Amino acid sequence: MRTLHTDTEREAAAALVQDRQRWLALRRLPVAAGADIPALFRDPRTQPAGLFEDGKLLACMIPKREPNPGWGKGPCLFLGSVHTLPDQPDDITRLITLWASDFAARLDLPLVRAEALVRHTLDAEPIAALLRRLTNMGWEIQGSGPGQEGDRVARLEITAERRSGLSTLIGCRVHEPHTATPKERGNT
């Protein structure tokens, strides 16, 4: 896992996001409507991060130190705009989960929070299957409501936990994320 520093890396992340959005749309699954997510990954000010294996980008996200994302209580590491390469196993999500929990603990943050787009109730398929997989990985569902980008989301959190030995499985070269500003959170 590393911060995406170069224009080439950020462009690869934007392309991954577009591929994932197309994949979701073809399956009639929810896609973020309110924001140009690929543009966020092209912007070096967002400090996006990517999960690589053998030089191949498997996932990307925008990690932020968040004092309060508008739901939940207290500070957290917020994983914004998480996208994985289409048609990949859940192992990628599991690695992101382990990394994020460990990274948050190393930043002295108590929690990791993330959001998953939803269209219907949380017990309706296909979101219910995704949420079951995430809860099996340790995530807790904190209800649903408007997300950081204004779309309806399932709100997720997991406790930060140092995971000794994780560095043999996944390396971390992610810069400490900045604190999200009210403008970045959509608050003015």
Model-based region annotation:
Residues M1-A35, G171-T181, N187-T188:
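Short amphipathic alpha-helix that is part of the acyltransferase structural core
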Residues A25-E53:
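Active-site rim helix/loop that mediates acceptor-substrate recognition in acyltransferases
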Residues G50, K56-P67, F78:
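Conserved beta-strand in the GNAT
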Residues V118-P146:
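Conserved active-site alpha-helix within GNAT-family acetyltransferase domains
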